[in-house]
Amino acid sequence: VGIFPPDIGGPATFVPKITNYFQDELNYEIEILTLSDSKNLNIKDDFSIKRINRDLPIIYRWLKTIFTIYRMGKNKDLIFVNGLGTETTIANIFLKKKVIRKIVGDPVWERAYNKGKTSESFDDFQVNNHGVAMSLQKKVRNFSIKNSDVIITPSQHLKNFILDLGFKNKIEAINNGVTIPKESAKIFSNNYLNITIVSRLVSHKNIEKIIEAISDLNNPLIKLNIIGEGPELNQLQSISLKSDFKNKIIFHGKLEKKDINTIFSKTDLYIQASNYEGLPHSLLEAMSYGIPVLCTPVGECREVLGNEDRGYFLNLPVSKDDIKSKIDEIINEKNIANKKSEEGKKFVSEKYNLTNTFILYKNLFTKLLEEEDK
């Protein structure tokens, strides 16, 4: 239950991969329920999927989603939740099935930040008071999380977040995994610097600051690839059009995985400037290609990059001046950036290999199914 392509983002990318593994390797029978834009309701899928129109009136959509989860869940052994957590919790009051939920962030904080209702960090937001409406949203979130049987997080930071909410059941921190490409990107193969961002276009990703920083550098040898969609697209395009750098900023929109891989193979630097991430999937993918990465020390990113021996950190709060400074540093010390990228690829290949991730999921789900059979 939850997010699924053609929606974008790390969770949407992960679900088809784990579904394929469960079906092909473990012979699980799987049905998927997701919300989709009206234009995507009838697209052809390789899985058994029920799509509900997210453009429906919210109360009607909410009730329809709860009823559909109940109807689809009656003959299932487990419910794996990657979104629609509150709706699943309500449906499961009647289903009484075992619920495994993957938590990759806090939707309450993300909504508040993207709507300009808070400028606080992820951690500060959890402990501070933000009025009755926000407190109610937090209570609903906590109720849903606490009624899960198992929580999976991609990072220790998110595991601690769940523990701080008072969750008493089983928590597993399972790293996101990526497929390791056979060949690395051909970084710094000429004088040009191809920079890539793969992201939902929302305010807490700070893409506006990246555009401003690169525009200020005014280096004709730099090109910026922005891959993704989101509510800030028009605003970001407007900012880029006003800059002298506009012909060097390319908005690719949502791309197929093979097309993203093609761009990665020609990328010299990957930037992730978010105010918060659990463990960004696209960052791991960039590192798997041996691409130097520049990111904020948030969530699990601090562990992934270590003491900057596998990449470069931006300071918080994110500023365009710091981004400019770090890009200049990388341009002037390409040999050091090369070494960091090699260490990054090695680290990701060993710790974040998708095969290892699948094995951990297999062990967890097998144990849960054995418990159900007792």
PLM regions: where:
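Short alpha-helical donor nucleotide-sugar binding micro-motif in glycosyltransferases
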Residues: 73, 145, 254-255, 262-267
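Acceptor-binding helix/loop patch of EC 2.4 sugar-transfer enzymes
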Residues: 100-139
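Conserved acidic donor-binding segment of nucleotide-sugar-dependent glycosyltransferases
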Residues: 307-320, 329-334
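Conserved donor-binding/catalytic core segment of Leloir-type glycosyltransferases
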Residues: 152, 187-205, 210-214, 225
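Aromatic "clamp/platform" in nucleotide-sugar-dependent glycosyltransferases that forms part
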Residues: 275
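Membrane-proximal helix-turn-helix segments that form the acceptor-binding/catalytic region
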Residues: 66-74, 123-151
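Nucleotide-activated donor-binding/catalytic signature segment of Leloir-type glycosyltransferases, i.e.
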Residues: 237-255
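Short hydrophobic beta-strand element within catalytic cores of glycosyltransferases
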Residues: 292-295
